[in-house]
């Protein structure tokens, strides 16, 4: 039984669809927002706000379905976005590279649900190495 099928047994379809919608929406905007982080100070702040809001939506939906691994990872990402918001920007190259790793992980997780695989993809341990320099 796949992870999506298990959710369908335990939760209302509307809740699952909302989670998948928020998750896919986040993954669809991640790359352009990450690129925007490195543009200038104004775009940096806008991108962080959009990222934080999209991530927050996934956290909310994942918690409603008791998807702790997704909720915890996205909460971690949300906290990093809040920390990054303390800087003026633009983002450092190291932070942009790290954000692309995060984006790849989120996209893998989202695809896992969409493809109804048996287990979530393995977590990339490099993500635990948050760069020291967030802003240039």
What is the role of each PLM region?
Residues 1-136:
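Non-catalytic helical tethers at domain boundaries
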């Amino acid at each position: 039984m796949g992870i999506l099928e298990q959710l369908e047994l335990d939760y209302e379809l509307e809740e699952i669809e909302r989670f998948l919608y928020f998750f896919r929406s986040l993954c669809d905007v991640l790359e352009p927002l990450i690129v925007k982080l490195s543009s200038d100070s104004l775009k940096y702040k806008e991108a962080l706000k959009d990222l934080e809001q999209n991530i927050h939506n996934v956290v909310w939906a994942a918690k409603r379905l008791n998807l702790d691994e997704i909720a915890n990872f996205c909460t971690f990402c949300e906290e990093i976005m809040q920390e990054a918001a303390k800087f003026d920007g633009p983002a450092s190259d190291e932070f942009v590279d790290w954000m692309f790793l995060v984006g790849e992980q989120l996209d893998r997780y989202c695809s896992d649900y969409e493809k109804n695989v048996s287990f979530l993809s393995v977590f990339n341990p490099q993500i635990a190495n948050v760069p020291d320099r967030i802003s240039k």
